[in-house]
A protein has these predicted regions:
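Short, gly/Ser/Thr-rich active-site loops of penicillin-recognizing serine hydrolases
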Residues: 401-423
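Beta-lactam-recognizing serine transpeptidase/beta-lactamase-like catalytic domain environment
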Residues: 129-131, 149-181, 196-391, 402
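Conserved, well-ordered alpha-helix/loop/beta-strand core segments that scaffold catalytic motifs
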Residues: 119-151
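Small/polar-residue-rich segments within soluble enzyme cores
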Residues: 115-121, 125, 384-385, 404, ...
Length: 423
């Protein structure tokens, strides 16, 4: 089916060429030049893993075809419509397009394009039946309650990083499983930005930052949810998820510090990092999770490292951050629940550390996230909740954020897990 779909798509492109050039709507030379401009644009952007031009890259390269150059064949076929005088010019265009696309084809055959990237499937070989039952019950309830497209809950052991529960639910069959899904972590990345900055000596919980918005970097505008915020400490910025503050934190720490530490926490800082954009812009995007792709497993394991006092799960159990930094992150994430955007995750009598996240996909499609662990001082469970395109109405408002949708689900899962463990 996939192959026939691709063939039909190719025929559709060729039929457009026939209508435009064959019926003399545009000269073959001019049309060929337009196609060459597409090739040139792809050559400038394709090697940067730019998500915005993924479809154009696919059209130009079509790497399933053995010669990898469908667009070049389209330009070549235009010579059939052109008079002898312009035929040589079109052949020149073909050669130019070939020269531009050749290195791109080689690069894509090695690295692959974003649209063809595949996540490693979630490891579910360590599931705990009791935790699995809790996760399945809670995600089924949440998807129904929030009229969501889909949702997923994962629970991990903070001592090993192993996933001990993984449950997903959707209102429609045939949706891509969260076991393979790649997505943006949104504001759930912010504790790791803070950890990198504190650990490097560039920041602290109490350090204050200018948080005025809008904030402009290289033509891109960044704003805060609350546009009235003027300044805040790092702890306040984490609690209230102040975008501009975290951007400034990342800029002070620097590209090398942030990328290195995020990589050590298990984040991919290469695939969505765009070489054609400035380091300042890329760093700002990273501070908000916009160019850091994650999976359910990679994100929950990063939070498990925080719960494990900053120690990784490799053979040496190496420390990614210092004990002092770990204490600061725990304190800030606990404050984010008691006094910040995660208030609906509060569990009476139990200390909770966590961070909300709200990701906007395709302009009006939302992911509501909450990641955290309980209890803070001696964590027993790490929990990640993601709700896709969920909502509910309250006092005439439609609520879609991680703090409003995912945080209450986290609370229910954590309460049930702790109760089950104490029986």
């Amino acid at each position: 089916v996939t192959q026939w779909f691709r063939v039909l798509a190719d025929l559709q492109e060729l039929s457009c060429d026939e209508v435009l050039v064959g019926h003399q709507k545009i000269s073959a030379h001019d049309y060929g030049h337009c196609l060459l401009q597409v090739v040139e644009a792809v050559s400038q952007c394709s090697l940067t893993s730019n998500r915005e031009i993924a479809c154009t890259v696919g059209m130009a390269l079509n790497k399933e075809n053995e010669d990898c150059k469908f667009i070049i064949r389209r330009i070549s076929m235009l010579t059939a419509y052109s008079p002898n005088a312009s035929r040589s010019l079109l052949l020149g265009i073909v050669f130019a397009g070939f020269s531009i696309l050749s290195p791109i084809c080689v690069a894509y055959s090695t690295a692959g394009s974003l649209t063809n990237s595949r996540a490693k499937e979630v490891d579910i070989s360590h599931l705990d039946p009791r935790m699995q039952q809790i996760a399945e019950k809670q995600i089924t309830t949440a998807v129904k309650q929030y009229h969501a497209k889909s949702g997923v809950i994962a629970i991990a052991d903070p001592q090993t990083g192993n996933i001990i529960a993984f449950a997903e639910s959707s209102k429609n069959k045939g949706l891509e499983s969260w076991k393979l899904r790649i997505f943006s972590p949104g504001s759930t990345i912010k504790p790791f930005i803070a950890a990198a900055a504190i650990n490097s000596g560039n920041s602290s919980e109490t350090k204050n930052y200018d948080c005025h918005s809008p904030y402009y970097i290289a033509g891109k505008t960044f704003t805060n949810y609350n546009s009235n915020v003027e300044s805040a400490s790092l702890a306040e910025a984490i609690a209230k998820s102040i975008n501009v503050c975290l951007i400034r934190v990342s800029q002070e720490a620097g590209v090398s510090v942030i990328r290195k530490k995020l990589t050590e926490f298990g984040f991919d800082t290469s695939t969505w990092w765009q070489a054609d954009r400035s380091d300042g812009l890329q760093l700002a995007m990273a501070a908000l999770g916009e160019n850091i792709p994650v999976t359910i497993e990679s994100l929950i394991k990063s939070y498990a490292i925080l719960a494990n006092k900053g120690h990784s799960f490799d053979k040496g159990n190496s420390a990614i951050i210092s004990e002092t930094t770990s204490y600061s992150i725990n304190h800030m994430l606990e404050n984010a629940v008691t006094n910040g955007t995660g208030k609906l995750a509060v569990i009476p009598g139990v200390s909770v550390a966590g961070k909300t996240g709200t990701v906007i996909e395709n302009n009006d499609k939302y992911l509501a996230l909450f990641a955290g662990y309980v209890p803070v001082d001696n964590p027993r469970y790490v929990v990640l909740v993601v709700i896709e395109e969920g909502y509910f109405s309250k006092n005439g408002k439609t609520l879609v954020s991680g703090g409003e949708l995912a945080a209450p689900v986290f609370r229910n899962v954590a309460m049930d897990a702790l109760s089950s463990a104490n029986r």
